[in-house]
A protein has these predicted regions:
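Short, hydrophobic beta-strand segments that form beta-sheet elements in well-ordered domains
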Residues: 25-31
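NAD(P)H-binding glycine-rich loop region in Rossmannoid oxidoreductase-like domains
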Residues: 34-35, 39-87, 91-94, 109
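Hydrophobic residues within alpha-helices
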Residues: 12-16, 88, 123
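A short helix->loop->beta-strand "cap" motif at the edges of active sites that frequently abuts
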Residues: 95-99, 131-133
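Oxidoreductase cofactor-interface core, primarily capturing Rossmann-like NAD(P)-dependent enzymes
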Residues: 8, 24, 110-212
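N-terminal Rossmann NAD(P)H-binding glycine-rich loop of SDR-like oxidoreductase domains
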Residues: 1-22
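SDR active-site strand-loop-helix element
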Residues: 6, 29, 63-64, 100-106, ...
């Protein structure tokens, strides 16, 4: 299938690219060269929708996201996690994408008092309004994997303690447990081209089930 991806250089994206490239025609839209084995369009984030315009797409995927440390302000954070994702999704739909797969967050809710979770909830609503035949929303817990120095102090502590905390997060709490980014990437690949139409939300248990 013809797959377009944004977020290839992030924690999940780096695992996702080789899996997608093995079986699909993959097109990466990125702000800088990735060194990954896939076709790349290198352009400022604001230009991605226009750069996608000439190529038909079957499935569009976003693993794009920034950190507060990188963004430096809420408007800059929102420009990446909301505006760039929605702009890419609309452009992908315009060139034929029938499925969109994205990473959100456990607890995403447009009515949340938590600014980040409210933003993720608004992104989900906006994506649902674009008109994809199938929308897959991944809502993992804390993602484990090598991020270098990009993690907040609380995230670093959470990842370090996750082998212990995951032991007590059972039942409904399991959706809040830490999960490997490689597992999320494999689940996203498993969803590419899924036949049923609709909006599907995948928490940790569903993500792990997709990988088997």
């Amino acid at each position: 299938m013809r797959v377009a991806l944004i977020g290839a250089t992030g924690l999940t994206g780096r695992s996702l690219v080789p899996l997608l490239a093995a079986d699909h025609q993959l097109h990466l839209l990125t702000r800088r060269a990735t060194g990954l084995d896939a076709r790349e369009t290198i352009a400022p984030m604001e230009e991605w929708p226009a750069r996608l315009g000439g190529d038909p797409v079957d499935v569009a995927i976003s693993t794009l996201g920034t950190t507060w440390r990188k963004a430096g302000s809420w408007p800059a954070f929102e420009a990446v996690d909301h505006d760039a994702v929605i702009g890419f999704a609309r452009a992908a739909r315009a060139v034929g994408a029938s499925q969109f797969i994205t990473i959100s967050s456990v607890g995403a809710d447009p009515e949340s008092r938590h600014q980040y979770l409210a933003l993720k909830g608004r992104v989900e609503l906006a994506l649902a309004d674009i008109g994809f035949d199938r929308l897959d929303i991944m809502r993992p817990g804390l993602l484990r994997g090598p991020r270098g120095g990009d993690r907040r102090r609380g995230e670093r502590i959470g990842v370090a303690l996750s082998p212990l905390t995951n032991l007590v997060m059972r039942g409904q709490l399991n959706r809040f447990a830490a999960i490997d980014a490689t597992t999320v990437a494999a689940a996203m690949v498993a969803l590419v081209g899924a036949p049923r139409e609709g909006r599907f939300v995948h928490h940790n248990p569903e993500i792990r089930a997709l990988v088997g």
